[in-house]
Swiss-Prot record:
The record marks 938 as: Arginine finger. GTPase activator for the Rho-type GTPases by converting them to an inactive GDP-bound state. GO terms for biological process: signal transduction. One of its GO terms (molecular function) is GTPase activator activity. Residues 15-34, 212-276, 300-345, 385-407, 448-485, 508-527, 827-848, 860-879, 1093-1150, 1171-1361, 1419-1469 are annotated as: Disordered. InterPro entries: PDZ, PDZ_6, PDZ_sf, PH-like_dom_sf, PH_9, PH_domain, Rho_GTPase_activation_prot, RhoGAP_dom. Residues 71-155 form the PDZ domain. The modification Phosphothreonine is found at residue 652. The keyword Phosphoprotein applies. It comes from Mus musculus. Pfam families: PDZ_6, PH_9, RhoGAP. Residues 331-342, 1133-1144, 1236-1248, 1440-1457 have a biased composition (Polar residues). This is Rho GTPase-activating protein 23.
Length: 1483
């Protein structure tokens, strides 16, 4: 109940030679006149202090009387009592003992002399006997400042002398290692009494075939428990073999107590007899003997054997009943397990500390279990590989005298009490031996007890006999009457250890003949006990109490035949059940005894009801549940399985973890299992516990209704072929059990028939864990959720085992049944059609044939999540599968609870019911930690973390854990807040008032604008107004700390403007046109939040004025037409010159880029402005743009032909002479001029700088290979512009570069070719053959846009230009032209036409003037100004890429820039001037 109870043990004195004068008590086989005097209790007076109170704490422990006492008293009552005295039934009442748990140093209790371990006897003069623990606590608490305690000192308490100090030792860590190397237990410092070995040792040696020296000593042998000092006759001799401890010769055991280490047996630990300690030693032993004799009176007519204390047992052995000459005795809470054979059991003085270190709780089955340590110490070790020893003593020695290897039933051992301390729960991975033999006594010296038949009293009708096992059969065949009840000590193997077929560690133990089980007995005889060696049967699954149950441990434990439990259940007194409240306490398990046992059961249950109401231990409960379940199974086994072969397979089959194996491995239910141990339920309940349940399909595979598809918590009780489900757990009892079995509960649904059912883990259930699916034979389907995985597996295996048909071999699944069921299922599914299911996702695959069947059922036709892709039923439900799945998923998907819902539906904050909780939480976190965080709300958080928080909040804001690291990132919190407002279905500024806010913000009058905004805000709905008020106040707080976080109102407005002020159907147009208004509205609200949201109406008269000037709004009207469409780069109405550069830039912008449309619009405008500005500056600075550079060249060439409209600075005029061609005669007329005017493109503004030398010269720039287009254009230029004349030669002149024309300007080429054909003369071939002048490498691809340096002094007219001048002229091309040539790839004419036709307009005008052919240019040979003048008209006419306006300007500028000496030459060409003027006028 409270704390960890002490381990109480009897006093096992050291086996010393008993002086003949020492009086023997009744337990020694003789009556004792009176016990030796025992020191009385001490009385202490404690005074309460204000700080510490009384300064001590208590612990409660319940001591049950030995089980032998129960049977003795029952027998006496059956025989009418002994001597007609009063009924000793009162002796069966458990005894409450209260010990001092802790004493505070320096406290009142410490000063008064109270010590840890002292046992309370009286409180304030009032005895605690008969009082509960709570009543004793109440007495102490109700005391005044003075408390009088009567205590039994720990050193003098008979209940603790054997326990000694090891109960208080630390270091309960489990030991891991070899079984033979388990360390010795802590020393015991209480006195022991040794006796001289009797003279009958040779008789024992003769009775044991193997010499003792040949036996490998087992330090854990309970054989060493013989307690000659207490009730062992003086004739009894104990042999101690210390070979395991390195001692070569046996000697009288100074401390034959099993957990006594070697140090404790030294003279310093135990004074020699005769010392001053001896009297107290004798008194202690005699008092304990007297106390025990009072506890266990002998029944009348009982044959006396050497006295031996009854074995006290704990919950772990309660699972293995004890049927011997004495009926199984009541359990002691304090001991784990002790085996006893005969009239009295061995006492154990094992502390749970050491037991935990020994790694396992001890378990004993019955008095026969005593055989295990005794015989195994004497002869078992040598036969360990092949033989299993068994003794079958019965209640009557004449029937089955105990073997000599067993020392008499009464002359061995001591009674012990062990506690269920938490250290019990500890275990190691190496568990080798029998339960009580291995775990509590590891590391102790091996004690081989020798005893002769003379040790038996005269009442013994025949001497004991040693029954030798047959190594070949590994079986012991005792007399038939002894085979009726046989219990085998099971072995607890280490974790994961495989089955060991050696039966050496098993013992067959004889039981009484009250409940014979002939079938089970015959079965055991027939199989020579061999299957008992297998470790796969039911009782092997009983988990040890001191370990966490695991599926892999207990499967290997040794099993117990069914009749063992059956007989023990019929004969046993109440067996301890683990308290559900604590591992410390147990209570009596009610079993079948007789009619007289009902009162005992009721008394025990009622006496310690409180002991089972608090917390409970998993492992203890598991053990009891499993034992209870296995007991039920085994009791029904003979009637259920008529075949002996089936029975044998039941015990030996390991493939189906049957009956109890699965259940212990799967941690049986932990709810209220220990309290359901009534007579009726114990017989037929296989498993029970709390489950969550819902029904999926009703009979014939029909979909269950909505009410049945809800998860409900039920108490499930699994019986033979049914599973009962009730809302409440039924109290144990025959009536309740009968009602439950009949399904008569009012709140209980009809039991689920599990016969031939299919059960497996429900892998498709993803929302709940530990769910298994049950499909019955009539096609009903259920889902059950267990508490944990072990519980789920336990239920599955239990249902599988109980669902088998009668006589079905449990070794494998019934294939025929499954096939038949599968066929029936398919027939039903095809006739009734596919059924829908609620499982959301696909199955991960169910293992085994049954699982395959579950996946293939057509009832799940629509459940594609249950079927593999290749399932046969896919075709049945194929048409409906897609929408069916979508509907299921949509229905299953939980609606969001935080994001994407209206403000009215959000969970409200505590401080303001109209503000969403998520908004309040985020704002509070930011205000608490982020006021000084730089860029708060501007720096985004991690998108993945924000998304995870959104999902968490959508599941329910109640799950918010602010300690989660995701809530520690301020940027994540700020992004979460922005995401909340961004996902609102209706924005904070509602849709119906959005336009009003935009219009109000555009009011010119500042005061009026503020008033209008305030009125609109007040008109918002309640939730929206309150949320906006809360948010703006928060942003105001952030802005107040802008000097640290750098977030001024404007910055916050840039962040929250688009999020708050928007429409539900936000579009691009609104975003572009209203973005400045959105910013301004939010900024105004933040700046004047107090005025906007103030409840004071008077403030309306003091309207604040926005002192700041309105923000400059960029002119973005030109972007509006481009929204949503791709606009061609050129506009027909735009200026051809200004747009040409933009066209060239836009021509290679990828059209597929999403941002191209916006970038093009902006680039066009900027390019136009830049061109215009440069053109204006070019006139004053002497530099020119791409177009102007060519215009200036033509102006210089035309010279005096144009009226002087303007003067150009010197550089442009100086360049002109260098570009003049050889002179022509004034009277020559050029040929017809074909002009190709390509508007809107700037590449025609550049002239080719290659010069043809008179000699036909050299070709430089070998790398500049002309393509077809360039070659064709060169021919056109030379043929058209050249003249044929005698003696004439081709002079240096600028020629058209091929890249000056657009790739698709085929119309211009056609016109030029036709003109060339008309004007071609004798010198055409020479003109064609004229090579281009030298060109420095790289000049054609130069990207220099303009030359800003003034050129060097131009050479005289008619002189050859220098290389520097030629290079300067070549670099005049624009970057756009050069880049266009470089990027252009040769394409087919049609492709080029499709690509470029939309960017250009080609106008070909036939000039009224005739162009000069090559011969005419030759006749104009002679240098001088006249020749140069004669060429200019053609040059002017050749510049067909200029618009009319630009050409006019160029001619005027060129004429003004010519020197005065050239003006006279221009007067001879009046027709050309007039023709040019007419051309411009036409254009």
């Amino acid at each position: 109940m409270n704390g960890v109870a002490f381990c109480l043990v009897g006093i096992p004195p050291r086996p010393e030679p008993r002086p003949p004068q020492l009086p023997l008590g009744p337990r020694d086989g003789c009556s004792s006149g009176r016990p030796l005097p025992w020191p009385g209790p001490r009385t202490l007076l404690l005074r309460k202090s204000l700080q510490d109170g009384f300064g001590f704490t208590l612990r409660h422990f319940i001591v049950y009387p030995p089980e032998s006492a129960v049977h003795c008293i029952l027998k006496e009552e059956e025989n009418g009592g002994r001597g007609g005295g009063p009924s000793p039934r009162h002796r069966l009442e458990p005894m409450d003992t209260i010990f001092v748990k802790n004493v505070k140093d320096g406290g009142p209790a410490h000063r008064a002399g109270l010590r840890t371990g002292d046992r309370l006897v009286k409180v304030n003069g009032e005895s605690i006997i008969g009082k509960t623990y709570s009543q004793v606590i109440g007495l102490i608490q109700n005391s005044d400042d003075t408390l009088e305690l009567s205590i039994m000192p720990k050193d003098e308490d008979i209940l603790q002398l054997a326990y000694s100090q090891d109960a208080y030792l630390k270091g309960n860590e489990p030991y891991s290692g070899e079984a033979r190397s388990i360390p010795e237990p802590p020393p015991l410092c209480y006195p022991r009494k040794t006796y001289a070995p009797p003279t009958r040792a040779p008789a024992w040696a003769t009775m044991v075939p193997e010499p003792i020296s040949a036996l490998p000593p087992d330090p854990r042998s309970p054989a060493a428990w013989s307690d000659p000092g207490s009730r062992v006759p003086s004739a009894t001799r104990a042999h101690l073999d210390n070979s395991s401890l390195g001692m070569s010769q046996p000697r009288p055991s100074p401390g034959a107590f099993p957990h006594l280490p070697s140090e404790s047996r030294t003279p310093r630990a135990f004074p020699e007899p005769g010392s001053r300690v001896l009297p107290s030693r004798l008194e202690c032993q005699q008092a304990l003997s007297h106390w025990l004799s009072n506890q266990i009176p002998r029944r009348a007519g009982e044959r006396r054997c050497p006295a031996m204390p009854p074995r006290a047992r704990s919950a772990s052995q309660d699972r293995l009943e004890d049927v011997t000459t004495h009926h199984p005795w009541p359990c002691s809470t304090s001991q784990d397990a002790l085996s006893q054979l005969g009239q009295e059991g061995w006492h154990r003085a094992r502390s749970d500390d050491y037991l935990s270190r020994a790694t396992r709780s001890a378990e004993a089955l019955g008095p026969g279990a005593l055989v295990s340590p005794r015989l195994e110490r004497c002869g078992w070790a040598s036969q360990r590989p092949s033989a299993r020893t068994s003794a079958c003593p019965s209640r009557d020695l004449t029937q089955a005298p105990p073997p000599s290897g067993l020392q008499g039933l009464d002359d061995i051992g001591y009674i012990g009490y062990r506690s269920y301390s938490p250290s019990f729960q500890r275990r190691t991975g190496l568990l080798h031996a029998l339960s009580f033999r291995d775990s509590p006594f590891g590391g102790l010296p091996t004690f081989s007890l020798a005893q002769s038949p003379a040790s038996f009293p005269p009442e013994a009708s025949e001497p004991p006999r040693v029954v030798r096992p047959d190594p070949s059969t590994r079986a012991l065949e005792p007399p038939a009457e002894d085979h009726r009840d046989e219990v085998v000590l099971r072995q607890k193997p280490p974790t994961g250890r495989k089955v060991q077929l050696t039966p050496a560690r098993q013992m067959n133990l004889g039981f009484g003949d009250e409940s014979p089980e002939p079938e089970a007995r015959g079965e055991r005889l027939g199989r020579k006990v061999a299957p008992l060696a297998t470790t796969e049967d039911s009782l092997a699954s009983i988990p040890f109490i001191d370990e966490p149950t695991s599926p892999s441990i207990d499967l290997q434990a040794k099993h117990v035949p069914a009749s063992a439990v059956v007989s023990s259940a019929m004969n046993s007194a109440p067996v301890l059940g683990t308290s559900p409240s604590s591992p410390t306490f147990t209570f009596a398990l009610s079993r079948h005894y007789s009619q007289d046992c009902s009162s005992i059961k009721a008394g025990r249950r009622s006496s310690y009801l409180l002991a089972i109401t608090t917390e409970r231990s998993k492992s203890c409960d598991d053990g009891l549940n499993t034992f209870r379940d296995e007991g039920r199974v085994l009791r029904r086994l003979p009637s259920r399985v008529p075949s002996l072969r089936v029975l044998r397979s039941f015990f030996t089959d390991g493939s189906l973890d049957s009956w109890g194996t699965s259940e212990d491995a799967d941690a049986p239910s932990k709810r209220h299992s220990t309290s359901d141990l009534s007579d009726a339920t114990f017989s037929d309940i296989r498993r029970e516990g709390w489950l969550y349940y819902k029904q999926i399909l009703t009979k014939k595979g029909k979909k269950a209704g909505g009410g049945l598809r809800q998860w409900k918590r039920v108490y499930a009780v699994l019986r033979a072929r049914s599973l009962s489900l009730s809302k409440e757990r039924r109290e144990p009892g025959p009536a309740a059990a009968g009602a439950a079995a009949a399904g008569a509960g009012e709140d209980e649904a009809a039991p689920v028939c599990i016969g031939s059912c299919l059960v497996d883990i429900s892998y498709s259930e993803t929302k709940r864990r530990h769910v298994f699916r049950l499909t019955t034979a009539d096609f009903c389907e259920y889902l059950f959720q267990a508490e944990d995985r072990d519980d789920m597996l336990g239920w599955i295996r239990a249902i599988r085992e109980n669902s088998r048909a009668e006589g079905e071999d449990p070794g494998c699944a019934n294939q025929a049944l499954i096939s038949k069921k599968l066929n029936d299922y398919r027939k039903v599914s095809h006739s009734s059609g596919p059924k829908a299911d609620s499982s959301p996702k696909g199955s991960r695959g169910l293992g085994g044939l049954k699982s395959e069947f579950l996946k293939q059922t057509a009832v799940r036709g629509l459940r594609t999540q249950e079927q593999p892709p290749g399932s046969k039923e896919d075709s049945v439900a194929a048409p409906k599968t897609p929408w069916g799945i979508n509907i299921i998923k949509k229905n299953k998907k939980a609606a969001p609870r935080a994001f994407g819902i209206r403000l009215e539906e959000c969970q409200p904050a505590t401080e303001n019911q109209r503000v969403p909780l998520i908004v309040a939480a985020c704002c509070r976190i930011v205000e608490a930690r982020g006021l000084e965080s730089t860029g708060i709300y501007r720096v985004p958080g991690n998108n993945a973390v924000v998304s995870s928080l959104q999902e968490q909040l959508n599941r329910g804001p109640s799950d918010i854990n602010l300690q989660d690291e995701r809530w520690q990132d301020l940027n994540v919190i700020s992004s979460l807040l922005k995401a909340f407002f961004r996902k609102l279905p209706e924005p904070l500024f509602t849709d119906d008032k959005y336009n009003d806010f935009i219009e109000a913000n555009r009011i010119e009058d500042s005061r009026e604008r503020m008033k209008t905004l305030r009125k609109l805000i007040r008109d918002l709905p309640g939730h929206y107004y309150e949320t906006l008020k809360f948010l703006v106040g928060h942003l105001k707080t952030i802005a107040d700390h802008s000097e640290k976080n750098k977030m001024e109102p404007r910055n916050l407005a840039l962040v929250f403007g688009p999020t708050l002020v928007r429409t539900s159907e936000d579009n691009m147009t609104d975003m572009v046109t209203h973005m400045p208004d959105r910013y301004k509205i939010v900024e105004t609200l933040i700046q004047h939040s107090d005025w906007f949201f103030s409840d004071d109406e008077d403030k309306g008269e003091r309207t604040p004025v926005d002192d700041k000037e309105p923000q400059s709004v960029p002119n973005i009207e030109y972007l509006l037409p481009n929204i949503g469409r791709t606009v061609p780069p050129s506009d027909p109405g735009s200026d051809s010159t200004t747009c040409s550069s933009a066209k060239s830039k836009g021509s290679w912008v990828p059209k597929k880029e999403p941002y191209a449309r916006e970038m093009l619009a902006i680039s066009f405008i900027s390019a136009v402005n830049r061109k215009r500005k440069k053109r204006r500056e070019a006139r004053g600075l002497g530099s020119s743009t791409d177009d102007d550079s060519e215009q200036e060249a033509h102006k210089a060439a035309v010279g005096t032909q144009e009226p002087p409209e303007g003067q150009l600075p010197g550089p442009a005029a100086e360049e002109a002479p260098g570009r003049l061609s050889p002179p022509t005669a004034p009277d020559e007329r050029p040929a017809a001029d074909t002009r190709s005017i390509v508007s809107g493109y700037s590449t025609l503004s550049t002239m080719d700088r290659s010069v043809c030398s008179g000699t036909g010269g050299r070709r430089a720039g070998a790398g500049d290979e002309a393509d077809d287009e360039r070659s064709e254009l060169s021919h056109v230029e030379t043929d058209t512009e050249g003249g044929a004349g005698p003696g004439g030669r081709l002079s240096r002149r600028p020629s058209f570069s091929s890249h000056h024309l657009m790739p698709c300007d085929t119309l211009a080429r056609r016109r030029l070719s036709r003109s060339r054909a008309e004007a071609e003369g004798p010198g055409a071939g020479t003109a064609r053959a004229c090579p281009r002048g030298p060109e420095p490498p790289g000049s054609a691809s130069s990207s220099s846009q303009e030359s800003l340096r003034p050129p060097a002094a131009a050479p005289a007219l008619g002189s050859r230009p220098s290389r520097v001048e030629a290079l300067r002229l070549r670099l005049r091309g624009t970057a756009d032209d050069m880049l266009a040539v470089r990027l252009r790839r040769p394409l087919s004419p049609e492709t080029r036409r499709r690509r470029s036709s939309w960017r250009r307009h080609t106008v070909v005008v036939q000039s009224p003037l005739t162009d000069l052919n090559f011969n005419e240019w030759k006749e104009l040979g002679g240098g001088g100004p006249q020749e140069s003048v004669g060429v200019r008209p053609h040059s002017d006419n050749k510049d067909s890429g200029l618009s009319s306006l630009e050409s006019t300007k160029a001619r005027a500028s060129s004429a003004a820039s010519l020197p005065s000496g050239d003006l006279g030459a221009l007067q001879g060409l009046p027709q050309r001037r007039s023709a040019a003027a007419r051309l411009h006028q036409c254009l």
